[in-house]
């Protein structure tokens, strides 16, 4: 039987939209932008299951809850990718590459993939602890997800030979995901709507510029004809034609 350790007291140490199962399980599941998969994952044996809507504070909360439980050695990424934030891709990049000196996740493609409340040591502990990331991004097939969880459990290497690390995440300011111990996730539908509104705004601006150009062109053309006609009449008058 794999060796197990006690997680930090009060685990999970950061509250959120999580469903908690067996704290001795080796599997954590991130459902990204999807909901409704949690109970099936818990029934399959996961330790903790929940979404991740943002590529900064959301990921910080995952790191904090994972490294405070040495038993979690696998991370399953599933559910629909969060448009704009790309939290699944950012989590993979974090595990593969870590963070730079500025806190930016190396290779991440999300909008703002910067970790302000988690240092390199915590990130490196997370990377050491998680031995495998199972990529089921954009998969909501319960059978595939639960099968992946069971396969991870069958390969359980036991708890990492390090003590739990407790991170104290600072409360975010206005408009951030965290405010105290509560979570205010960014809806993926809103993120998609904002992206479409930006595209529409750009198209409107382009159309306005084109209309302005056309208006100036036609006005100039009319003025040119009028001036040409006036000059012609003047010349005819001078020549006595």
From Swiss-Prot:
5-hydroxybenzimidazolylcob(I)amide binds at residue 85. Pfam families: MtrA (PF04208). Residues 1-220 are cytoplasmic. Binds 1 5-hydroxybenzimidazolylcobamide group. The complex is composed of 8 subunits; MtrA, MtrB, MtrC, MtrD, MtrE, MtrF, MtrG and MtrH. Belongs to the MtrA family. This is Tetrahydromethanopterin S-methyltransferase subunit A. GO terms for biological process: methanogenesis, from carbon dioxide; methylation; one-carbon metabolic process. The chain crosses the membrane at residues 221-241. It is found in: Cell membrane. It catalyses: 5-methyl-5,6,7,8-tetrahydromethanopterin + coenzyme M + 2 Na(+)(in) = 5,6,7,8-tetrahydromethanopterin + methyl-coenzyme M + 2 Na(+)(out).
């Amino acid at each position: 039987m794999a060796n197990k350790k006690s997680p930090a007291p009060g685990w999970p140490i950061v509250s959120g939209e999580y469903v908690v199962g067996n704290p001795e399980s080796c599997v954590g599941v991130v459902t990204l932008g999807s909901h409704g998969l949690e109970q099936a994952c818990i029934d399959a044996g996961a330790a903790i299951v929940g979404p991740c809507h943002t590529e900064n504070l959301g990921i910080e909360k995952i790191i904090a809850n994972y490294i405070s439980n040495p038993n979690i050695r696998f991370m399953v990424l599933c559910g629909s990718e969060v448009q704009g934030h790309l939290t699944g891709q950012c989590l993979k990049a974090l595990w593969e590459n870590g963070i730079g000196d500025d806190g930016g996740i190396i290779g991440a493609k999300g909008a703002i993939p910067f970790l302000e409340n988690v240092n390199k040591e915590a990130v490196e502990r997370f990377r050491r602890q998680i031995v495998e990331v199972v990529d089921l991004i954009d998969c909501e097939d319960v059978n595939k997800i639960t099968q992946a969880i069971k396969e991870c459990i069958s390969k359980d290497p036991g708890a990492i030979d390090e003590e739990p690390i407790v991170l104290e995440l600072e409360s975010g300011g206005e408009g951030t995901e965290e405010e105290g111990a509560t979570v205010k996730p960014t809806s993926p539908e809103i993120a998609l709507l904002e992206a479409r509104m930006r595209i529409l705004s750009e198209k409107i601006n382009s159309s306005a510029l084109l209309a302005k150009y056309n208006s100036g062109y036609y006005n100039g053309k009319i003025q040119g004809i009028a001036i040409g006609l006036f000059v012609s009449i003047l010349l005819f008058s001078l020549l006595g034609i």
